[in-house]
Amino acid sequence: MEGSKLAAAILGEVRRAVVGKDEVLAKVLLAILAGGHILLEDIPGVGKTTMALAFSKALSLRYNRVQFTPDVMPSDITGFTLYNKEAGRMEYQPGAVLCNLFLADELNRATSRTQSALLEAMEEGQVTVDGVSHPVPQPFLVIATQNPAGASGTQLLPDSQMDRFMEIGRASCRE
């Protein structure tokens, strides 16, 4: 299928779930095709999460979603090792980020330590747990949503994390 027809088909599928945000949908698709991670910022209840899930379905990507809150731990994102008594050894239990599309919902509600757990996966395409690196599946994409800074329970994302996102700001999400 020709590139423009494929893009139109993907956008058509996403529009079945997200209505009235054509400019934002086009920007998100361009960011995905460019291989970038995406940050969607807007007030609660305008469809940021629905949009991210619609893209994962339209692109047939295996996705995981974490609703970030202050009690989410870095190991929820990266995974952890656990002793397997039957096997007599430690075994890696994959975290939520080991998927094709990771939806980091309300990322700016998590602690800085948990937010930082995403950095290695976003920058290097792997997570390291107990000194062992585990590659993330390819393609790999993070779509993060956040509420505006200053909203109750939110904090600013560090510059080192912001640098890894293509930001689609709140003005364009409000159409």
Name each model feature, range by range:
Residues 36-38, 62, 98-102, 124-127, ...:
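Loop/turn-to-beta-strand initiation segments
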